[in-house]
UniProtKB/Swiss-Prot annotation:
Positions annotated to bind Mg(2+) 1: 250, 262
EC number in record: 6.3.2.4
Role, per record: Cell wall formation.
Keyword list, A-Z: ATP-binding, Cell shape, Cell wall biogenesis/degradation, Cytoplasm, Ligase, Magnesium, Manganese, Metal-binding, Nucleotide-binding, Peptidoglycan synthesis
Cofactor: Mg(2+); Mn(2+)
Catalytic activity line of the entry: 2 D-alanine + ATP = D-alanyl-D-alanine + ADP + phosphate + H(+)
GO cellular component, one term: cytoplasm
Protein name: D-alanine--D-alanine ligase
Pathway(s) of this molecule: Cell wall biogenesis; peptidoglycan biosynthesis
Textual note on the cofactor: Binds 2 magnesium or manganese ions per subunit.
Lineage of source species: Bacteria, Pseudomonadati, Thermodesulfobacteriota, Desulfovibrionia, Desulfovibrionales
Subcellular location field: Cytoplasm
Length: 302
């Protein structure tokens, strides 16, 4: 097949996207596909033309224009199949506040949170006080995320987030252990336990991508009953958000209770990223995972 590999883009996660695309391209070539690469930041105006002549588009974008559903909507214009969520579900899930509203409405536990708009700043906070996490309302890879122990740190953290966007999600600090659960073709995969470095407050950008980053253990050495509970929550959230093919849900376990933090519609796809790690434990090599995602993407268009 002629596969259009879409990576790069203009979000803060551009370099992560390009890094992951290298391994995907190698896998596609080894699977016997013809690969054409396009970076929306450099050749946006030709995407529809390229997609129209492709048999499949493999999306490896983080943030806009991939996780917000823009590229998917464009691919739908020319009926080019792709892996992952449709535009509407992508747009909904990238917005952390909207996603947490869905969790709250359907009884899925998530840490207490508030949405703060740039026009209001810290004055927009009604109930939460430090310690809290401050996150960009849209985005991933923990870019711009800060941990505030004091009111002064909270104000600085919100200012940092407002330099990246017009809204911030402030989330109550929940002490516990971090785990992640991927889902592939409707089936939850083995959990991964994440141990950030000793000097990290959370699973930040450095922990995710540096060689001396977090320790990741798969399968997670936690109680089987709790494991099954987290897998069930992952499947429920995946369905409620209208996601397809695959996704990854991030949790914090506090005193034996799992709290769902967020869901990723285009999770990292380097061979050592979390979803490929879990897929390997489930019996898929990296190349087999890529092949499976192509199969799932094509199935949706039939």
């Amino acid at each position: 097949m002629h596969v259009l590999l879409i990576a790069g883009g203009w979000s803060e996660e551009r370099e992560v996207s390009l890094s992951g695309a290298k391994g995907i391209e190698q896998a596609l070539l080894e699977l016997g596909h013809d690969v054409e690469f396009v970076d929306p930041a450099k050749d946006f105006k030709n995407i529809l033309l390229l997609a129209e002549h492709a048999d499949f588009a493999f999306i490896n974008l983080h943030g806009s224009p991939g996780e917000d559903g823009l590229i998917q909507a464009m691919l739908n214009q020319v009926n080019c199949p792709y892996q992952g969520a449709e535009p509407e579900s992508s747009f909904l899930t990238l917005n952390k506040a909207a996603t947490k509203t869905v969790f709250d409405h359907h009884g899925i536990l998530t840490p207490k949170w508030e949405l703060v708009c740039a026009a209001d700043g810290c004055k927009g906070l009604q109930d939460l006080e430090p310690p809290v996490f401050i996150k960009p309302n849209s985005g991933g890879s923990s870019l711009g995320m800060t941990f505030a122990r004091t009111a002064e740190e909270l104000e600085k953290g919100i200012e940092t987030v407002f330099s990246l966007g017009d809204s911030a999600l402030v989330e109550e600090y929940t002490k516990g252990i971090e785990v992640t659960c991927g889902i592939l073709d409707g089936e939850p995969m083995p959990l991964i336990l994440i141990n950030p470095p000793d000097n990290a407050e959370f699973f930040d950008y450095h922990s995710k991508y540096a060689l001396d980053g977090a320790e990741e253990i798969c399968p997670a050495p936690i109680d089987p009953v709790l494991t099954e509970q987290i897998q069930q929550i992952t499947a429920k959230a995946h369905k409620l958000l209208g996601l397809t093919d695959y996704s990854r849900a991030d949790f914090i376990i506090s005193e034996g209770v799992p709290y769902l933090l967020e869901v990723n519609t285009l999770p990292g796809m380097t061979p050592t990223s979390l979803v490929p790690q879990a897929a390997k434990e489930a019996g898929y090599s990296f190349n087999e995972l890529i092949a499976k995602l192509i199969e799932l993407g094509q199935r949706k268009r039939k």
